[in-house]
Amino acid sequence: MFEGVDKKIYSSVSVDDVKESKKAVDCLCEYGHEKIVMLAAQPWDESISGLRVQGYKKALEERQIPINENLIRYTFQEETAFTMENGYKLMKELLESDEEFTAVYAISDSMAIGASKAILESGKKIPEDYSVMGFDGLDIAYYYNPSISTIRQPVEDMAKETSKILFDLIENNADNRHKIFDGELVVRQSVVRLNK
């Protein structure tokens, strides 16, 4: 969902970013992880990144896991927040700190892949040392080694719905519509159950 969008003026097609982000973090928690890093966009972002951070916090709060704000890492890049480069940089910074964690959740598969590269370069292993979860369902996440767990967005269905709404608005002067799709949790090689 898009916060701040006037639903009377605009149409929208999206996933519920809070709900789907919570689903990703719930999965990590169910695998025994409590010290979970969140790689996000700018701290002032109230749209996609901000909503996914809300889902992260909600999952931890519901399980009464304390939120360590030092494990929420933000990029300050304005236009290219969701990139592999930013995931890589944020993870390198974190690995050089004293913060302890067992899992990484990135707001995009691209950031998850960048973070994974930094983890592997540090001599650590995925998932033996750190589990990694992304968001989007990009093909590259499947082909990366180890394959990245993710929340897959139904991109084709969302594109079809967007076209349908657009043509209906143009041809029939229809009212604005808002469609929310469910994402799919896809657990792959990058997430492992934590042995306590």
PLM features: residue spans?
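Mobile cap/lid helix-loop segments that gate and shape the active-site cleft of serine hydrolases
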Residues: 1
